Amino acid sequence: MSQEDAFYGKGSYGASSGNSNIPPQGFQPVYPVAGQLDNTAPYVGAVAEGTAEGIVSNGEYAVGAMGAAPTNIIGSVDQQPPVSHTSHKSRRQYPAEVFELTNTLAASPAPPSLSEPSYVMARTPSSSPYPHDRAEVGTKSLSAQFGGMSLGADGAAAMPTNELVSVDLYNQTPEISDLTSPPPPINLPLSYSATGAATSNCPPKYVRSTINCVPTTNSLLKKSKIPFALVIRPYTSLVEEDDPVPVVTDTIISRCRRCRMYINPFSIFIDNGHRYRCNSCGIVNEVPQSYDWDSFRNVQRDRWQRPELNYAVVDFIAPQEYMVRAPQPLVYVFLIDISFVSISSGMVGTASRAILESLDRIPNKEGRAKVAFIGVDSALHFFSVSPGAEEATQLVVSDLEEPFLPRNQDLLLNLRECRQGIENLLERFQSMFATTRDSSNALGPGLKAAHRLIENIGGKICCLISSLPNVGVGKLELREDPKLLGTNRESSLLHPNDSFYKSFAVECSTSQVSVDMFLFSSQYQDVATLSCLPRYTSGKTQFYHRWNASRSEDALKFASELTNYLSMEIELEAVMRVRGSNGLRMSSFYGNFFNRSSDLCAFPSFPRDQSYVVEVVIEDTITKPFVSFQTAMLHTTCNGERRIRVLTISLPTTNSMTDLYASADQVAIAQYLTVRASEKALSSTLNEARDSIISKLVEILEVYKKNLAGQNTGAAIPLQISTNLRLLPLLCLALTKHTGFRRSSHISSDLRSIALCYLSTLPTPLLMRYIYPTLYSLHDMPIEAGTVTEQGVVLPSALNLTSALLQSFGLYLVDTHIHQFLYIGKDAVPQLLIDAFGVNSLADLKAGRFTMPVIDNPLNVRINAILGKLRSLDKGSTIMPSLYLVRGDGDPQLRSWFFSHFVEDRSENSPSYLQFLQTLKEKVRD
């Protein structure tokens, strides 16, 4: 048995090492191996008696308990044998469903009776050394609510801490369930919050910190080599009703007069409640006079029921002084490429039908939404519809040097008043240009015209492009050179090729205009240049490689994603600022937006399917037991209401390297390294991007070995790290093997550029799946997998991404969030093919883009349920993953693409995981 086989337990995952035809013990065989008797098959459809331990995985994150006992203790390498994966000889483990942790203090008054958020933090147990009786809050003197609490450094020393437990990476199989496990808990006593509510601290699905215990000095942070950053995701669903947060409706907003932080659960009330001390800068502020008065019912209100004192995530309805101008309507300008390439590929017809079918999904509660349509080829084609008219008038502007609006009105169409004319236009849009032979694409002039149309009110420009812009301002050249791919000069292909797009993006941001790109490739599209527009205007880039409407899978994917895009509730005219306690400064910002100042991020429209990373610098020594960060986003909802979304997270402080490492969040660190490397790839070189990932990992391992690792025993020298960071090396390796960073001469610049777009913006759960895809074994999944319970569809347990675990007769699913792959082994038997796909042989299955058939068979039903469940997990994304069928005896290129996701294997120019660990081991030697 090879070293790799032993590491991953080969023989227990695949067929027995002695005889590949011996069935796994404890399973009832269902599918016979070709050429073997039925009772010797290693395919299973049932598990041994009893239910499998664990339950459904739904992609949610549990929240670390404030003041609760540490939950991330696993045991040391000396106390615990190496982790091994569940074999076919025992029942599989399922990732646990996250249950809401409810209030355990029955005597405590409940938070406001609002729509309960999906996050609820555990309360301090009664045995905690930090007594807390919330019933006293409001009945005793307000100045006594924090009685006995020290705000000095001594107070921090008494807090519970996470235990540091070391593991030897080289002797432990990566425990990939950690990717969906909660981060190390934030050990902050509930008594530090004003009301003691379990929802006082921000849950990780909104804000994650790379360290959940903040060093008191910059020297300690530098010495630790752990990056300090926040991962922020203000919205977790495409529509608010899917994940509502409490709303402060009385427009009474109290903010610190010095640092401007909003009052929050960690504000400290003094002077009998007339004033409060800011938990960020420490200055004393007056409480608004009407803070305890319900102006709607004209009665006294209970202060301790106010949402902003009980919930870390709230929306404030903004008063008039927060408005520069009246709320503007939601506006979409569809800029459509109507060149010969677009018409012949079917893009124009598919897009017009998708828009038509999505008109009722566009947020338009107040009836103010507006749309416009501009076609571009060698001229600009405008479409005018008068209110109540049934037909549109086409107006053509051929002057591309100085494009102008042919009419002052009726180009921007009220969706409700002009509905019939809009529908008729979209129904015949494809046929209007069916005979075109024009191959020109005047994207630049079209963008300028669209901007001029909406510059006074703002909105979104949705570009649907199938060919390279080749006339007018912003025209691009075909610069793809296969000889540069995989070389040091490849980075030049990832940099913008025309300054027009970045300068135009800045102009759009100033006038509250956002640009989104839907790019369809039949050839080179220069994604690197065109993605500049969404990057600086808070937009998004979607790329459809080799798209053609004649493939139903292609048409369905685009139509679904465009529908999701138009259905998404977006926030308009938004600005976001992240504030921190004294001594902390936000230094760098990553994501799609424009920096108006050093710490103010501007979003003409705020998408709900992206996340942002903010790097933090410690400038002064911190003397308080905890620090606070607050993200505030001022915006206008798509229904015309001005609001401020506020997210507050407080973290304990420490002067201990041990506490720092025990509280580090490997997932947040991986996301920080990802966005920083993506930035380097776009501004510098791919080599520097890859080096930045590995060098930071080596620094962390070196510090751990020097300061925290146990004494080496025996002849073998371990490669140690704490349990909460044990997946960081694997994630770093996966990053360097990702399409965005992998050294390869077979990755086009367009594919690499779109990968960098996704790596820079995907929310944390989806990013982890994109970096380290999820692998499921479907031919031998337990009987519970794919069935529906009260918690939803049960998913099989995930496997490590190594081909050592694949069987030649198996059926597997790989999910990257962007793509899904069904892999059927070359030795698959007819019964498996019949049950899964309704065919008798592999030859009857066409590899490539694939639609899973729906047949009356239990296995097929379960597989379809699993595919649907995985797509439903992405409720905060507009992306519908493409499904591919890969045959073990099929197209070598398709197989190569599939196996490129197996990041623990050795691949082109890249080591296996074990080889990578050996390299790290050599780098961190004294």
From Swiss-Prot:
<dbReference type="GO" id="GO:0008270">
    <property type="term" value="F:zinc ion binding"/>
</dbReference>
<feature type="region of interest" description="Zinc finger-like">
    <location>
        <begin position="255"/>
        <end position="281"/>
    </location>
</feature>
<dbReference type="InterPro" id="IPR029006">
    <property type="entry name" value="ADF-H/Gelsolin-like_dom_sf"/>
</dbReference>
<dbReference type="GO" id="GO:0030127">
    <property type="term" value="C:COPII vesicle coat"/>
</dbReference>
<feature type="binding site">
    <location>
        <position position="278"/>
    </location>
    <ligand>
        <name>Zn(2+)</name>
    </ligand>
</feature>
<dbReference type="InterPro" id="IPR036180">
    <property type="entry name" value="Gelsolin-like_dom_sf"/>
</dbReference>
<dbReference type="InterPro" id="IPR006895">
    <property type="entry name" value="Znf_Sec23_Sec24"/>
</dbReference>
<feature type="binding site">
    <location>
        <position position="281"/>
    </location>
    <ligand>
        <name>Zn(2+)</name>
    </ligand>
</feature>
<feature type="region of interest" description="Disordered">
    <location>
        <begin position="73"/>
        <end position="93"/>
    </location>
</feature>
<keyword id="KW-0862">Zinc</keyword>
<feature type="binding site">
    <location>
        <position position="256"/>
    </location>
    <ligand>
        <name>Zn(2+)</name>
    </ligand>
</feature>
<feature type="region of interest" description="Disordered">
    <location>
        <begin position="107"/>
        <end position="134"/>
    </location>
</feature>
<keyword id="KW-0653">Protein transport</keyword>
<dbReference type="GO" id="GO:0070971">
    <property type="term" value="C:endoplasmic reticulum exit site"/>
</dbReference>
<comment type="similarity">
    <text>Belongs to the SEC23/SEC24 family. SEC24 subfamily.</text>
</comment>
<dbReference type="InterPro" id="IPR006896">
    <property type="entry name" value="Sec23/24_trunk_dom"/>
</dbReference>
<dbReference type="InterPro" id="IPR036174">
    <property type="entry name" value="Znf_Sec23_Sec24_sf"/>
</dbReference>
<dbReference type="InterPro" id="IPR036465">
    <property type="entry name" value="vWFA_dom_sf"/>
</dbReference>
<keyword id="KW-0472">Membrane</keyword>
<dbReference type="GO" id="GO:0000149">
    <property type="term" value="F:SNARE binding"/>
</dbReference>
<dbReference type="GO" id="GO:0005789">
    <property type="term" value="C:endoplasmic reticulum membrane"/>
</dbReference>
<keyword id="KW-0333">Golgi apparatus</keyword>
<keyword id="KW-0256">Endoplasmic reticulum</keyword>
<dbReference type="GO" id="GO:0005801">
    <property type="term" value="C:cis-Golgi network"/>
</dbReference>
<feature type="binding site">
    <location>
        <position position="259"/>
    </location>
    <ligand>
        <name>Zn(2+)</name>
    </ligand>
</feature>
<dbReference type="GO" id="GO:1990753">
    <property type="term" value="C:equatorial cell cortex"/>
</dbReference>
<dbReference type="GO" id="GO:0005829">
    <property type="term" value="C:cytosol"/>
</dbReference>
<keyword id="KW-0479">Metal-binding</keyword>
<dbReference type="InterPro" id="IPR007123">
    <property type="entry name" value="Gelsolin-like_dom"/>
</dbReference>
<dbReference type="InterPro" id="IPR036175">
    <property type="entry name" value="Sec23/24_helical_dom_sf"/>
</dbReference>
<dbReference type="InterPro" id="IPR050550">
    <property type="entry name" value="SEC23_SEC24_subfamily"/>
</dbReference>
<comment type="subunit">
    <text>The COPII coat is composed of at least 5 proteins: the SEC23/24 complex, the SEC13/31 complex, and the protein SAR1.</text>
</comment>
<dbReference type="Pfam" id="PF04815">
    <property type="entry name" value="Sec23_helical"/>
</dbReference>
<keyword id="KW-0968">Cytoplasmic vesicle</keyword>
<keyword id="KW-0813">Transport</keyword>
<dbReference type="GO" id="GO:0000139">
    <property type="term" value="C:Golgi membrane"/>
</dbReference>
<keyword id="KW-0931">ER-Golgi transport</keyword>
<dbReference type="Pfam" id="PF04811">
    <property type="entry name" value="Sec23_trunk"/>
</dbReference>
<dbReference type="GO" id="GO:0090110">
    <property type="term" value="P:COPII-coated vesicle cargo loading"/>
</dbReference>
<feature type="compositionally biased region" description="Polar residues">
    <location>
        <begin position="73"/>
        <end position="85"/>
    </location>
</feature>
<dbReference type="InterPro" id="IPR006900">
    <property type="entry name" value="Sec23/24_helical_dom"/>
</dbReference>
<dbReference type="Pfam" id="PF00626">
    <property type="entry name" value="Gelsolin"/>
</dbReference>
